[in-house]
Amino acid sequence: MMRSHYCGQLNESLDGQEVTLCGWVHRRRDHGGVIFLDIRDREGMAQVVFDPDRAETFAAADRVRSEYVVQITGKVRKRPEGAVNTNMASGAIEILGYQLNVLNEAETPPFPLNEYSDVGEETRLRYRFIDLRRPEMADKLRLRSRITSSIRRFLDENGFLDVETPILTRATPEGARDYLVPSRTHAGSFFALPQSPQLFKQLLMVAGFDRYYQIAKCFRDEDLRADRQPEFTQIDIETSFLDESEIMGLTESMIRKLFKEVLDLEFGEFPHMTFEEAMRRYGSDKPDLRNPLELVDVADQLKDVDFKVFAGPANDPKCRVTALRLPGGASMPRSKIDEYTKFVGIYGAKGLAYIKVNERAKGVEGLQSPIVKNIPEANLNNILDRVGAVDGDIVFFGADKFKVVSEALGALRIRLGHDFELLTCEWAPMWVVDFPMFEENEDGSFTALHHPFTAPKCTPEELEANPATALSRAYDMVLNGTELGGGSIRIHRKEMQQAVFRLLGIEAAEQEEKFGFLLDALKFGAPPHGGLAFGLDRLVMLMTGAQSIREVIAFPKTQSAACVMTQAPGLVDAKALRELHIRLREQTKVE
């Protein structure tokens, strides 16, 4: 072997021993005729000292530069008093180098590895192989590996089988656009890359495998955000003969064990909250419980006021009027209020009403707001009592369609929590349950809130009679306002699956064309089953404190779904297109 130890393995117990290291020159220093090289490998860093007494080795050390790949042999010794570096795991020792072999030279990197804060993300992605040398980046990928190992170990110990499902499959309606792959052997036909292994894992339950898992690559051709990539990794789990409480208990144990093993954090039992309560109190189906701010409905106090902005929504069952109190916010300048007004506009809000509570004892005179003149004093007091307002607070209001108010004030709640440093703890895991089966569109049609294979909490007849009020057997695990994973009990009876398809506007012929294999499987003794899928990239992002999932993926795509390093996607030659029976149309030039 070319090395005897990794740099990160060196410590005082090796004092006096000979070691051989392989790695990159992180930094070179020349102090008073002695050369110091900081050598870096994937496990850490070590300081190597070269004395001029060994002329040949000293000369070789004098020639090396940053990022040269080297092999060094030397003797471990304790550092002199006062020279210990507490920032390095091996900081109590150094190596007296007496043999140096340059394995490869290196040009000057496009950016220094220890000064990366001003380097643009595109440059970092173009030279990702350099960027990944930084200890901060290597640490994230190393932690990712520990996370997947812990999860695999837990699932293996609990009787789950790791089964691979196809990557080349057919398009199914799962909400986002599919990545399509043309078939050379079936002219005019296309495979689709899977958005999830959903149907295959259900078929594995029909086949009797009982407990399945897979760390699966999934693909979605959608607009990208900070927590989205066109290809992402999913921890996919499915079980038979367990109900939702048992599946939630099992996967909660897995996450608790993971955080204990990897971060040495003890989580208690995760609280449960219904979808309806989460939307009402937090304006989100993935609330961040670290934030103490809450939305409070006040429509009943504003139905009869002579102020249409409030009275209209207050009397409309499809709308809501909500208050959000910010403790100590009365000193907020108008410019900041305008900034927050612009912010909620992103979510469709037409404005942001507010009341500053300067001195409640003075009644209306102690309140500062353009809206107080339109609301009777008794109603104002009821509202302020309900939200718990005291002197020095500011209360914001939203009045509009339920979805607009929930999203706008829910987002404002999160923004205020961060801007005013209100978070009360570092971690807040929870479960959200009792989701609606469907979302009703403007035209009265329905869309599956999760996916079309989620089981409802009712019979097919009850579902078709009252689809708008039907609840599903779905559950989401949420951590710090981020959905870690979502799952449900699945439909295992053909009649129920057909009823759901009908409500989604998928008629019998289309059902047979797109889902005939699933409907067939449900006829042949499908067991009760359910599961859950975790987003691995998001989980690693939270556990490492990264700002984006691009920071925890070795070779991510940009926000335009491109790889600047390999220049993918790229053009292909005409011969390959002909073999695939594809002809490119000329793009119309816009003058």
Curated annotation (Swiss-Prot):
EC number: 6.1.1.23
Residues that hold ATP according to the record: 220-222, 229, 483, 535-538
Chain positions covered by the region annotation Aspartate: 198-201
Site feature Important for tRNA non-discrimination, where: 31, 82
Keyword Nucleotide-binding: yes
InterPro entries: Aa-tRNA-synt_II, aa-tRNA-synth_II, aa-tRNA-synth_II/BPL/LPL, Asp-tRNA-ligase_1, Asp-tRNA-ligase_1_N, Asp/Asn-tRNA-synth_IIb, AspRS_core, GAD-like_sf
Pfam families named in the record: GAD (PF02938), tRNA-synt_2 (PF00152), tRNA_anti-codon (PF01336)
SUBUNIT field: Homodimer.
Family: Belongs to the class-II aminoacyl-tRNA synthetase family. Type 1 subfamily.
Protein name: Aspartate--tRNA(Asp/Asn) ligase
Annotated source species: Pseudomonas entomophila (strain L48)
Gene that encodes the chain: aspS
